[in-house]
Regions:
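Acidic, metal/ion-coordinating pockets
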Residues: 14-223
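N-terminal export signals
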Residues: 1-13
Length: 223
């Protein structure tokens, strides 16, 4: 599943702005790294420079400023032998992201491949703010918050994080007892809740641009 990230709404109306000013807010977004710590395909035993944590770290270091928001939209711990490290104290992919210093991390659909206990363990290792506001435990507890507010250069940024509802199709057994709600509906509730408290709202969504399987809310265009 592809990940989509985009600005949703400016939170303040022009009429409510007393002093106009501008700044450059840069958003660096990564996703679908799929266990690639280095630019190397371990299964094929050959170089693969299509994207890796090492390359991301370099790009982020070269471009980061005081007004840069760095986010990742998941599919991090699956493929390229990454599953071999799920029982480590800190998964090497997570350790690398911690070293880079991400602001926000959102789960991808492949994070659910190994069961919820494993996922919760891995998420506890993240230093970034973990967001996934549409997955709930059997007790009704959210897997993670649905949003966070981050200040960059005096700008209050509301960041919403959701995962595709189709994880119940692909990992139904792993999600037994858990509830996955519609990410579009959840996002709209959050927008109404925080729109007067932030300057801008962005969404970090691990889902396609258009709907998959005709499922409403599985594409960001519904938002």
């Amino acid at each position: 599943t592809a990940a989509a990230m985009g600005g949703l709404v400016p939170a303040a109306s022009a009429a409510g702005i007393k002093d106009l000013w501008s700044m450059d807010l840069q958003i660096l977004a990564t996703s679908d790294t799929h266990g690639k710590f280095d630019p190397w395909d371990y299964a094929a035993n050959k170089a693969d420079a299509s994207g890796s944590v090492a390359q991301q770290a370099t790009a982020i270091k070269e471009n980061r400023t005081k007004t840069t928001l760095v986010v990742d939209a998941g599919d991090t711990i699956q493929a390229n032998s990454a599953e071999l490290f799920l029982n480590d104290d800190v998964h090497p992919m997570i350790a690398a992201q911690n070293a880079i210093g991400y602001d926000v991390y959102v789960t991808g659909n492949h994070e659910y491949n190994y069961g919820m206990a494993t996922l919760e363990k891995v998420l506890s290792q993240q230093k970034a703010k973990v967001l996934t506001g549409n997955v709930y435990s059997p007790e009704g507890k959210p897997l993670a918050d649905g949003y966070t507010i981050i200040n960059k250069g005096g700008v209050k940024i509301g960041v919403i994080g959701m995962v595709t509802p189709n994880i119940t199709r692909w990992d139904a057994k792993n999600l037994e007892g858990w509830t996955v709600t519609n990410p579009v509906d959840e996002s709209r509730k959050i927008i109404d809740k925080i729109k007067n408290d932030v300057d801008v709202i962005i969404g970090v969504m691990h889902m396609d641009v258009d709907n998959e399987y005709g499922v409403y809310g599985s594409g960001v265009t519904d938002l």
